[in-house]
Amino acid sequence: MNTKTCSIQMTSGSLWKNILMFSLPLMLTQVLEVLFNLSDVAIAGKFADYIALGAVGSTTLLVSLFTGFLIGMGSGVNVRAAHRLGAGDDNGVRLTVHSSLLVCSIIGVLACLICLLLAEPMLNLLKTKSELLPSAVTYLRIYSLGMPAMAVYNFGSGVLSACGETRRPLVYLSIAGALNVALNLFFVICCGMAADGVAIASVISQYLSAALIVIHLCRRKDCCALSPSRKYISRRACADVLMLGIPARIQNAVFAVANLFVQTGVNHFDAITVSGNSASANADAIIFNVQAAIHTACASFISRNRGAGNHSRMMKSYFVSLTYSFAAGAILGGLLIIFGRRFLSLFANDTAVIEAGMERLSIMGWSYAIASFMDCTIAAARGIGKTIVPTIVVIMGSCVFRVVWVYTIFAHFQTITSLYLLYSFSWAITATAEMVYFFTVSRKDRFAEEKSALEKSA
């Protein structure tokens, strides 16, 4: 297998260095995605009108739900490709690459069709304001046309990440994102368009990023190359990608539902508290995206080393990733506690709102580090091909538990602190259960690998 294209060695060298170098481009990619998504909202609000701003904003939940599934498929591709690469199975890699492209493309087309056909009913279900509904429906339908391209880009990003190549997807996303901002300005300012112009810009940029990554894969000379003239399709590979990718997205969807109950609790308080909660919640996306990059590295390194039969390095990859994730959560959370008022002043001018936001940050600031144990362990379990049980555990521990907390602990104390503390407790409980499960199955996995190796050598 040609490994020259693999920019970061996963099965040899310093794990401390390689995991960090693998994660940094992913962190930048995550931050860029947040910034480019914000550009849609900012340009719609600044240069169009409040209807355009509201229309784009009212589709956020649905867009996040559907794009989340597409991103999840990319993570499934990443884990399976990394495992086959680690095992030195060139044909298995080819089957994974081509089967994954088929699966991701189908999922992307299905997501597009659902949004095209059900955009208005779904937005009505979310109680979208009548004055915003026509523009919101138009935006969602146009935006959905880019979902097949988004699925293909995430497929390609998953393949390249499995190779240890995380810089190239960052470059492609940067190019497409810059075009997105430029087209947003062109369609809205020069053409006088509103939400529809913003959606068209997004679709064009998504197809550009997909085209760039597909062209690169077609030009590769190794087993990760796309060969349109050959048929490398495997039902097993298709099933594996689905089993690895879908549970994580179901988990995120249930998280969103559980957080609606938390928001209901917040809404029991005055407008200042609600505004402070909203302002401080902006920190979540930043810190979780940084940690998510490390968790992707964790799954990739574990899967790659598992394929290579290197159990000790596999476990060390977990502990190194966990250390980085914990450090990121602790350091960034600590900075938020220290400089929280300055951070909140970016979103609010009212002193009372800032102080209300600090109530949340003072608890969440040290809770992000706790979350690292949960999320990193889930990623590690995914790296060894285990997704169903971790998903059930996180649904029970971090979702069902939150709903129960709201109707028991919070209902008893009726304080905002008692509500915010549910994050810390739910993450701690879930992390404990996930770690017990991971260490149990990883031990069994090691014994199974050793037995298989002995049988082959006999």
Question: Which residues does each PLM region occupy?
Answer:
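N-terminal transmembrane alpha-helices
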Residues: 10-47, 61-76, 80, 105-112, ...
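Transmembrane alpha-helix boundary and packing residues in multipass membrane permease domains
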Residues: 26, 30, 42, 79, ...
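Short runs within selected transmembrane alpha-helices of multi-pass transporters and secretion channels
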Residues: 74, 143-161, 169-180, 198-213, ...
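Short alpha-helical transmembrane segments in multi-pass integral membrane proteins
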Residues: 1-23, 81-148, 190-246, 302-367, ...
